[in-house]
Amino acid sequence: MTPLKIAIAGANGRMGRVLVEAVNNHPDTVLSGALEHSGSEALGLDAGYAVGLKTGIAISDDVDAVLAQSDVLIDFTRPEPTLKHLQKCVEKQVNIIIGTTGFDDTGKAAIHTAAEKTGIVFAANFSVGVNLTFHILDTVARVLNEGYDIEIIEGHHRHKVDAPSGTALRMGEVIAGALGRDLKQCAVYGREGHTGPRDPSTIGFATVRAGDIVGDHTALFATDGERVEITHKASSRMTFAAGAVRAAVWVNGKTGLYDMQDVLGLNNR
């Protein structure tokens, strides 16, 4: 079997470094390119330098050259560069795995349009455990559909720039969908001052940013006399990186828009 050629965007970032390691660890993949922004101090360095690997791949800012020798790009950067990379992937017929969060509706629409011409796995979280949690939340919300107040609490490291996290928002979307609600209409993001009694139809969000928290997410269903808490805690970014590489292998040869539920076969159950 010919190894799948994977390029990493943001290769010198916290997530990018772990992705380089994950590609190196997978028996069916090989690192074909590593991208960083123009002016990065890492340009020219071996992509594996930060994790003690010698990959033979130099970090570059030449998107066209990197994609020309790749089957798939994994991108966990920020919305603006991801959308630029996405258009290049469409031009070069390269699949893309998108772990970037914080897209507005226009950005999401661009991803949907691009999926008509290339294979895309776009997910708020690539952890197997988190995606199983999404599946569980759908069932729980359908059962606890009356008389329960729903709150979502998430925590991440001090460097995370978007809030709530994409994973927390996806949890909210799953729960709202199971209840027949529109998250845009029922979400409450933080509370301050005299807020009055809680509206039972709302889904609340609370955000923590501190230290080096990799990712903590809890969905709380509370009523008089009991509460149900469903929690996922990530202790290593390798959880997300390994899932992204798994998605890259899975989407090879496919066209269309998929998420991690598709990769794991959970959408067929």
UniProtKB/Swiss-Prot annotation:
A Pfam family? DapB_C
| One GO molecular-function entry | NAD binding
Q: Which GO terms describe its cellular component?
A: cytosol
Q: What is its EC number?
A: 1.17.1.8
Q: Which domain of life is it from?
A: Bacteria
Q: Where along this sequence does the record place binding of NAD(+)? A: G10, A11, N12, G13, R14, M15, E36, G99, T100, T101, A123, A124, N125, F126
Q: In which pathway does it act?
A: Amino-acid biosynthesis; L-lysine biosynthesis via DAP pathway; (S)-tetrahydrodipicolinate from L-aspartate: step 4/4
**Which residues does the entry assign to the active site, renumbered to this chain?**
H156 (proton donor/acceptor), K160 (proton donor)
- Supply the InterPro entries for this chain: DapB_C, DapB_N, DapB_N_CS, DHDPR_bac, NAD(P)-bd_dom_sf
The name this protein goes by in its record: 4-hydroxy-tetrahydrodipicolinate reductase
Tell me which Gene Ontology terms the entry assigns under biological process.
Answer: diaminopimelate biosynthetic process; lysine biosynthetic process via diaminopimelate
Family, according to the entry, reads as follows: Belongs to the DapB family.
Which reaction(s) are listed as its catalytic activity?
(S)-2,3,4,5-tetrahydrodipicolinate + NAD(+) + H2O = (2S,4S)-4-hydroxy-2,3,4,5-tetrahydrodipicolinate + NADH + H(+); (S)-2,3,4,5-tetrahydrodipicolinate + NADP(+) + H2O = (2S,4S)-4-hydroxy-2,3,4,5-tetrahydrodipicolinate + NADPH + H(+)
Which subcellular locations apply to this protein?
Cytoplasm
Per the entry, what this protein does is:
Catalyzes the conversion of 4-hydroxy-tetrahydrodipicolinate (HTPA) to tetrahydrodipicolinate.
* Keyword NADP included in the entry's annotation: yes
Q: Keywords for this entry?
A: Amino-acid biosynthesis, Cytoplasm, Diaminopimelate biosynthesis, Lysine biosynthesis, NAD, NADP, Oxidoreductase
HAMAP family given in the database record: DapB
Q: Where does (S)-2,3,4,5-tetrahydrodipicolinate bind?
A: H157, G166, T167
Q: Which organism is it from?
A: Neisseria meningitidis serogroup B (strain ATCC BAA-335 / MC58)
